[in-house]
Amino acid sequence: MVKIVIPKEIKEVLDKILENGFEAYLVGGAVRDYMLHRRSNDFDIATNALPADIIKIFGPSYKTIQYGCYNMRIGSYNVDITTYRKEEAYEGRNPSKITYTNNLLLDAERRDFTINAFYMNRNEEIIDLYDGQKDIKRKMIRAIGNPTTRVREDPLRILR
């Protein structure tokens, strides 16, 4: 089996955030794909840096920052950098209110499924708060929190 490595360009993004005194983790589907030895061109980074801090580090984004998410392209890679946050009730597919937090555990609570809630640091060490690795081995998709609520928040989650 071929070992997939995190692209150098993505590690450089993590390094810039870390060098500025903030936490930075790859999170979500890219980490899941990494564990399954699949390549990804989409990378999500979770950090305790606020959107204004991210703009200071990387400059203005070509997209408007919404919900604490900063988007950038590096070659063929799409990178979303999102501030740790808590979300309140949804209006359509988006939360009615978000609150930034310094707490990775609170950020993890808003994730949809256990197999998308992995956090991986720059050294490729994985934090698995919800036993997602077991779910991957069992080929099981399990919601974090109430499954009905998770699907109602964003019905497209079922398709992704």
Predicted features and spans:
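Catalytic cores of the polymerase beta-like nucleotidyltransferase superfamily
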Residues: 1-160
